[in-house]
């Protein structure tokens, strides 16, 4: 009996010790995570840095922040969310003027999961909803006075839960719920059938090109088809209106099949924007949004689809490199989005380059046919009125290298409206270009504006664009930008396709009569009055006009990314040919499934290559921790120019350890007591900040209508206002720095982070990101534009080798960032997870050259959130210009040990340079506002850190005690058992 009791105690202590160890591990893990997220925890608790912004709001007379001004602000913020949708919703289709709805058309039925459970935004880092205020399509319809069929709503509420909505599943309800009394209810609510179609993807997950059912995720799934068929077969609905709740350009070639009357693209409207879209439906607002991506009939018809996703390296007998198992190659070159569809269209019309071959066709019944391949062009959008455009004149100022287009817009309808003026150009495609593999898009966006035009009135607007946008990058001949000789055609139109038709009419005249078509296949004539011609003054290709940077004339612009081209690394039998309009049929991309890792490529994939330079300075050559006669505090540097010598004195006060404090981000930057610099919080993201307000009801920060909507407004003022309102959010949340906006290019409609980027076009993103960043700066917020660059997919994002040629890099992918970073509006940039070629972006010297030299960028550089990994070498990153390590406080410690152990003055100089940028940037934020001089920083740890450390000690002690007790009881059990056996042996 005693033995059983003893064993029972041992087992109990075994269970208790196991539980204690588990709890201790959980507590330790929680502590680690909390310390990694220190800035966000401090922000949530109102500790250290909670007062790091010092006013500047426009919602109080003197700029001070208060509960009262917050109430004014939050009302305006939600109104602006609705304005985003009012100006950014795109009317794609409107058969027989089905929209706007009359006041008598108010008895409606909603269909589709998105009507009651829309995709408000992606789930990437960003704002959370405030449920009491969010608006679904049903909410917005009811608020607007519509009588929504309750029987159908009840049917959805009681139906079996649909399949989870994901990147590979639409997650639509089973249409079997529409039976009996449910379908009987249609007659009473038959004015309009509203169908909301939604698609979802997010950070870390691209939309599945083909799902488990073998369908493209951007075509209608079977349940959606059944819904439309049910509506059509019922015969009860006067109109069918689609709300397209998808930032991903869906396939829309089925509208006639299901008798759809109208389609309104609403994108991801954020939590509060949907009422703005419904005002477009009712006609309270005249639609003025235009597409930011091409809607193809088959979403895999773009040449980028041939090389999207993961493609595996073949290492053979070599040991694979860390995070180096996959690659993607942009074999389409510059022919991204509309630049492909429109260029192939022109060449088909003119019989050039075998453009009408079947190669690359996905929706055409015979040879390549524009009207069968494209549903809605880039830049396209309908209105409830009609506009006529005249390009009155075109002026060129050679001193500023600026073209000014004067455009008159006439509203020939009976409704007031906002007209979007889109200015495009066609540049010559010459023999020189063909010989040197310089590609030319048939039409390219140059600039835009938006103006109010009353019914029956005309307005004139000027659009200024840099002449530099007409240059093409020649990576093979001139190894720089070139300006071809010949005629340049400028045109305006409702999207790229109409503008191109206008150019072709002006350029070719009778030769294209009867050949020009719109996206529906209707023959059009083109509007030559919307075209102006400029003849370049050079009679042969000019390779010198743009030889030096327009932002830093001392720097020559020449090839920087030769090693980003897959052909730089590939064996001869694996080299690729980039898509060329000179031969569509023989250069159309095929999938590069694998790439042999030869010795050159293997060495290139190794990121652990840093070696201290032989001529590196010694740490002793630097003055650190200097006690000045008069201490210079953080606030004393307010207003001090970046190149002022005072910075040397200020930074000399800091020790190496103090310099490294700024360089480890923990969702914020810690305080530095030595110079009385407060800590601050840094937050994500492009769709809204993942923080809470410090005033009023302390609700979550605003979840805006997302960046594709901002881009689709085609309105500089609205885009700037988005940045300002985002900045106001930051003021009321005491946040000086945010990781936003996103500016990567939508190379594929399947890109997982589409909701965080503006457009498929680098120029539209150039202007939009510039405007948003400018608006943020107006409010004391440092926007951090991301992810720089070639980060167009989520698959394999950490370490994937991204290959592209330099023309595409410069004209498409870098240009999207150029407006915000080179024009001086943004002082923050985040590099990407991927490799540029084989070199990790944050360790790529080419990126530093572009930013610091060519673009004369004066802000800070941060890597994307990547903890210690062999492909992200801390010293390599630092030497390549990375100033702060995102969500990584271990890297600065690594740097400190390396500097002190190797006496590496080069690394130390980079640490000092990084602090120069970081302190300067923080002072340009709301941290440098009035009141900063009153800040006194304590070096005491926040209370929650002390508490967590105490809990760590307590639970670890309990775990140790439990283990000790288990060991003791186990030993006692064994000893007792031995004694029992001995006694038994003696009895025998």
Predicted regions and their residues:
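Terminal connector regions
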Residues: 467-542
């Amino acid at each position: 009996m005693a033995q059983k009791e003893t064993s029972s105690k041992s087992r109990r202590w075994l269970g208790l010790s196991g539980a204690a160890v588990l709890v201790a591990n959980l507590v330790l893990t929680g502590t680690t995570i909390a310390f990694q997220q220190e800035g966000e925890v401090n922000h949530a608790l109102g500790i250290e840095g909670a007062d790091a912004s010092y006013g500047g709001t426009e919602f109080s007379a003197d700029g001070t922040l208060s509960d009262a001004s917050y109430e004014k602000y939050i009302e305006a913020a939600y109104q602006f969310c609705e304005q985003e949708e009012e100006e950014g919703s795109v009317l794609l289709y409107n058969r027989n003027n089905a929209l706007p709805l009359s006041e008598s058309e108010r008895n409606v039925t909603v269909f589709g999961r998105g009507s009651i459970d829309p995709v408000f935004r992606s789930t990437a880092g960003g704002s959370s909803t405030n449920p009491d205020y969010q608006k679904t399509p049903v909410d917005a319809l009811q608020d607007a006075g519509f009588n929504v069929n309750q029987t159908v709503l009840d049917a959805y509420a009681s139906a079996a839960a649909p399949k989870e909505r994901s990147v590979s599943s639409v997650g639509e309800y089973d249409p079997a719920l529409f039976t009996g009394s449910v379908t009987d209810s249609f007659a009473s609510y038959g004015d309009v059938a509203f169908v909301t179609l939604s698609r979802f993807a997010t950070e870390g997950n691209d939309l599945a090109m083909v799902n488990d059912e073998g369908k493209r995720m951007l075509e209608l799934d079977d349940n959606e088809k059944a819904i439309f068929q049910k509506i059509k077969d019922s015969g009860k609905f006067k109109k069918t209106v689609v709300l397209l709740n998808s930032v991903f350009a869906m396939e829309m070639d089925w509208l006639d099949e299901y008798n759809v009357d109208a389609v309104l693209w609403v994108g991801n409207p954020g939590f509060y924007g949907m009422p703005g879209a419904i005002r477009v439906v009712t006609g309270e607002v005249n639609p003025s949004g235009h597409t930011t991506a091409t809607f193809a009939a088959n979403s895999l018809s773009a040449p980028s689809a041939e090389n999207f996703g993961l493609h595996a390296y073949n290492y053979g007998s070599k040991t694979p490199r860390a995070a180096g198992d996959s690659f993607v190659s942009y074999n389409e070159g510059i022919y991204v989005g509309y630049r492909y569809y429109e260029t192939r269209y022109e060449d088909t019309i003119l019989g050039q380059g075998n453009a009408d071959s079947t190669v690359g066709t996905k929706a055409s019944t015979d040879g390549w046919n524009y009207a069968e391949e494209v549903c809605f062009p880039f830049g396209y959008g309908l209105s409830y009125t009609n506009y006529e455009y005249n390009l009155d004149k075109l002026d060129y100022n050679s001193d500023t290298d600026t073209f000014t287009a004067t455009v008159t817009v006439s509203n020939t309808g009976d409704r007031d409206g906002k007209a979007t003026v889109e200015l495009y150009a066609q540049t010559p495609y010459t023999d020189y270009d063909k010989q040197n593999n310089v590609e030319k898009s048939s039409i390219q966006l140059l600039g835009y504006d938006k103006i109010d035009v009353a019914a029956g009135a005309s307005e004139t607007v000027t659009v200024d664009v840099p002449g530099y946008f007409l240059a093409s990058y020649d990576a093979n001949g001139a190894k720089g930008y070139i300006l071809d000789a010949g005629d340049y055609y400028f045109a305006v139109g409702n999207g790229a396709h109409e503008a191109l038709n206008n150019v072709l009419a002006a350029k070719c005249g009778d030769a294209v009569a009867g050949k020009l078509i719109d996206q529906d296949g209707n023959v059009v004539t083109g509007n030559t009055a919307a075209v102006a011609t400029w003849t370049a003054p050079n009679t042969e290709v000019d390779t010198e006009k743009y030889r030096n940077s327009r932002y830093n004339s001392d720097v020559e612009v020449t090839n920087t990314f030769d090693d980003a081209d897959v052909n730089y690394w590939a064996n001869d039998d694996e080299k690729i040919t980039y898509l060329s309009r000179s031969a569509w049929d023989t250069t159309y991309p095929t999938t590069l499934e694998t790439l042999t890792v030869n010795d050159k490529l293997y060495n290139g994939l190794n990121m652990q290559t840093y070696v201290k330079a032989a001529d590196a300075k010694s740490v002793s050559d630097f003055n650190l921790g200097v006690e000045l006669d008069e201490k210079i505090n953080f606030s004393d540097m307010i207003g001090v120019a970046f190149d002022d010598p005072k910075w040397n004195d200020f930074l000399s006060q800091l020790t190496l350890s103090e310099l490294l404090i700024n360089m480890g981000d923990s969702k914020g930057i810690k305080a530095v007591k030595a110079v009385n610099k407060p800590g601050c919080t840094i937050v994500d993201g492009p769709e809204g900040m993942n923080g809470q307000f410090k005033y009023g009801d302390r609700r979550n920060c605003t979840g805006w209508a997302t960046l594709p909507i901002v881009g689709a407004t085609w309105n500089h003022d609205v885009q700037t206002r988005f940045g300002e309102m985002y900045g106001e959010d930051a003021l009321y949340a005491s946040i000086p720095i945010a990781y936003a906006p996103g500016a990567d290019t939508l190379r594929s409609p399947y890109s997982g982070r589409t909701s965080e980027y503006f457009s498929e076009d680098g120029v539209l993103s150039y202007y939009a990101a510039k405007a948003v960043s400018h608006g943020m700066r107006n409010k004391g917020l440092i926007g951090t534009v991301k992810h720089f660059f070639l980060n167009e997919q989520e698959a394999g994002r950490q370490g994937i080798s991204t290959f592209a040629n330099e023309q595409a890099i410069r004209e498409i992918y870098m240009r999207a960032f150029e407006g915000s970073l080179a024009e001086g509006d943004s002082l923050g940039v985040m590099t990407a997870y991927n490799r540029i070629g084989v070199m990790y972006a944050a360790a790529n010297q080419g990126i530093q050259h572009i930013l610091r030299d060519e673009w004369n960028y004066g802000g800070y550089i941060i890597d994307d959130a990547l903890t210690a990994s062999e492909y992200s070498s801390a010293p390599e990153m630092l030497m390549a210009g990375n100033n702060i390590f995102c969500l990584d406080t271990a890297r600065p410690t690594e740097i400190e040990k390396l500097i002190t152990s190797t006496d590496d003055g080069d690394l130390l100089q980079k640490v000092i340079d990084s602090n120069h940028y970081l302190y300067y940037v923080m002072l340009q934020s709301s941290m440098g506002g009035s009141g900063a001089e009153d800040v006194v920083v304590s070096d005491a740890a926040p209370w929650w850190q002390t508490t967590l450390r105490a809990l760590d000690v307590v639970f670890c002690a309990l775990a140790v005690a439990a283990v000790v007790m288990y060991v003791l009881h186990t030993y006692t059990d064994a000893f007792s058992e031995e004694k029992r056996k001995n006694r038994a042996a003696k009895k025998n």
